């Protein structure tokens, strides 16, 4: 699992829309019901980084047919983890062989992006070793791959009503079951996502 360096953070994603740029860092993207993309349908994406050069996020509600125990085995780690049975998430279509850990505790890992007071993103192997040994962050999720947007692409998709946006709530990432996260985020907008059409958006 490679480190997350400054080049990675801005590789394959960057936006500049007309008018004043507004960053959606530490926001959720809630897929509109009409979004038919097989990767992002009914998805909830946490935006980790968003500048005028692009955006990067992790999908937090798409479980794979893979567990943390499988990852530990692939990395030849001794598995003492109480969380070994937890599902690995499909974080997005970019760098799908690479692991990313979203977690609450900041810790002292080799490659951590501090996104919000209670949300961090680490892409170095040391955190996986710690999780395998039950010494990792108390609240975390493990994803393979990430979602990336080039300059202006995310803004265009929001204008096209592909996404709803809302400031992120870390409890949805870490405390709510995977299958409930999409609807839970939408409820914070005061809507029932299951009753929405694809003809209205919120930016």
UniProtKB/Swiss-Prot annotation:
Record-linked Gene3D superfamilies: VC0467-like (3.40.1740.10)
The chain's coiled-coil residues are none
Cystine pairings recorded for this chain: none
GO CC, one annotated term: cytosol
Report the sequence similarity comment from the record: Belongs to the UPF0301 (AlgH) family.
Query: This protein is called what?
Result: UPF0301 protein Sde_3637
Task: Supply the source organism for this entry.
Answer: Saccharophagus degradans (strain 2-40 / ATCC 43961 / DSM 17024)
